[in-house]
UniProtKB/Swiss-Prot annotation:
GO terms for molecular function: structural constituent of ribosome. GO terms for cellular component: cytosolic large ribosomal subunit. The keyword Ribonucleoprotein applies. It holds the Pfam family Ribosomal_L38e. The lineage of its organism: Eukaryota, Metazoa, Ecdysozoa, Arthropoda, Chelicerata. One of its GO terms (biological process) is protein-RNA complex assembly. Belongs to the eukaryotic ribosomal protein eL38 family. PANTHER family: 60S RIBOSOMAL PROTEIN L38, LARGE RIBOSOMAL SUBUNIT PROTEIN EL38. This is Large ribosomal subunit protein eL38.
Length: 71
């Protein structure tokens, strides 16, 4: 079962962990963006409803992380 995070700061800390492997970004037509970070034990997700916040979060992801965008 994936773990849903509420805070963007908490998500960024999770994405910077050593066991974080990749991030998937899923965009829905009604301005809902889901970020999913795969760690060794859990898949952590966060739902962002604002387009500007989603773009900011995408830019602040760690550079060494593999990012995959889904439709």
């Amino acid at each position: 079962m994936p773990k849903q995070l509420k805070e963007i700061k908490e998500f960024l800390l999770t994405a910077r962990r050593k066991d974080a492997k990749s991030v998937k970004i899923k965009k829905n037509p009604d301005n809902v963006t889901k970020f999913k970070v795969r760690c060794s034990k859990y898949l952590y997700t966060i739902v962002v409803t604002e387009k500007e916040k989603a773009e900011k979060l995408k830019q602040s992801l760690p550079p060494g992380l593999q990012v995959k965008e889904l439709k």
